Design a protein with these regions (language model features):
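Short, flexible helix-loop junctions that flank or precede catalytic/ligand sites
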Residues: 6, 12-21, 25-406
């Protein structure tokens, strides 16, 4: 194999990969590369993604080739542009690694990439998704890592108020805690930390988790993986597990009215329930339950609190600098952060606990604006206000906060 790939393989240090964002140079491969070359290319792309702690690898087909991007700290960065002659072979190699049908190019496919762990033992899972487009097949690999240093609830970065409230919720014997936020906002990490907290503080409790799929193994928790298109669905698994004498249940996601009804009823009958919902705000989550057909009195009787969270990029500690006018820190850029000015992400969150005022509003079927007004008048600290705490501390910037909260 000749051409730029050999050169790139030698140059591909961490900084070189990311600096291509600012100095974009197409590293187009020559035609006629054999299968071994593509195997090495894909292997190197996967290795480099892990070395940079990328959360996702995108292989995006275009009219002229295939573009490879890494998602780093929530932001997509182009790292390679490869010729069209390699596109099919690259996707075919990914399919082989994921155990997918290499001869079907016209259907979406999903799988898991199995690799030796000599270079990325910290990776727990690699999920592969293939999708046909007008320019060819698009592939995305999502990487799941061992979350060193994030095992405990106290390590996640919650404000003292939210941390204390979550500790109190974990002590309860029944009720429902809902988590909201987009994909990649740390909900699974928070749920895992909550379960570990309960097991440490209250050993001997029966703790069960129903997930799609199981993302990380938690010692002491009975974990069940559902099959959405088979017989083991969320409602089926949940109904059966309630007869297994559980005390604490974590349900990966409330996706439908049937699951919502079972979760709410379980929260009223001596079970502590944790789950997630698709909603942008805590008030929106409460209304979503009503839209699913849950009676207002059931919502107010079972739901203890709603936790809404996001992740924002964290300023690089090595190069951040204060603005003389605002006395707030700004991004700068250095070798440690690959000239981005940011390194890692940090949690921002808001927690709404159902008090008498909010319960009365839900029972009265108040709309979203009315619920938001009640929270504001009650002095609720919303997501952006929690984020400003981190801006003042010099952990992130107002601009980054606005990207997430805006």
């Amino acid at each position: 194999m000749d051409g730029n790939y050999r050169e790139n393989k030698q140059k591909w240090a961490k900084k070189d990969v990311i600096m291509q964002r600012n100095d974009r140079k197409n590293s187009i491969q020559p035609k006629g590369q054999d299968a071994c070359d593509v195997v090495g290319l894909v292997d190197d792309l996967l290795k480099k993604a892990v070395s940079l702690a990328a959360s996702d690898i995108h292989f995006e087909p275009t009219s002229s080739g295939i573009v490879v991007k890494y998602r780093l700290d929530g932001v997509l960065n182009t790292v390679e542009k490869l010729p069209r002659s390699l596109a099919d072979n690259i996707v075919a190699r990914l399919k082989v690694l994921g155990g997918l049908l290499t001869y079907r190019n016209d259907i979406p496919q999903e799988g898991r990439i199995q690799l030796q762990d000599e270079y990325d033992g910290k990776v727990l899972d690699r999920r592969l998704a293939i999708y046909p487009t007008i320019h060819g097949q698009r592939a995305v690999v999502r990487l799941f890592y061992e979350e060193s240093g994030l095992d405990k609830l106290s390590q996640l970065g919650f404000s003292p108020y939210i941390y204390s409230a979550l500790e109190q919720i974990a002590r309860q014997n029944q009720g429902v805690l809902l988590l909201t936020g987009p994909a990649g906002s740390g909900k699974s990490t928070t749920l895992a930390a909550l379960l570990r907290h309960i097991l440490r503080c209250f050993p001997g409790k029966s703790v069960v988790a129903i997930e799609d799929p199981v993302e990380r193994h938690i010692d002491g928790v009975t974990q069940v993986q559902i099959t959405p298109h088979g017989e083991m669905t969320f409602p089926t698994a949940l109904r059966s597990l309630l007869r297994q004498d559980p005390e604490v249940l974590m349900i990966g996601e409330i996706r439908d009215a049937e699951t919502a009804r079972i979760v709410i009823e379980a929260g009223l009958t001596g079970h502590l329930m944790f789950s997630t919902m698709h909603s942008g705000t805590p008030a929106g989550a409460l209304l979503r339950l009503l839209e699913m057909g849950i009676e207002p009195y059931q919502v107010t009787s079972s739901v203890t609190a709603v936790l809404n969270q996001r992740l924002v990029r964290k300023l690089c500690d090595k190069c951040k600098k204060p603005n003389p006018q605002t006395q707030l820190f700004e991004a700068n850029g250095c070798g440690e952060c690959f000239e981005a000015g940011f390194r890692g992400r940090v949690l921002i969150a808001e927690l709404v606990q159902l008090d008498g005022y909010l319960r009365q509003a839900v029972l009265a079927k108040a709309d979203l604006d009315e619920l938001e007004d009640i929270l504001k008048n009650r002095g609720h600290m919303n997501l952006c206000q929690d984020g400003m705490r981190l801006v003042r501390e010099g952990t992130t910037t107002e601009e980054e906060l606005n990207k997430v909260c805006g």
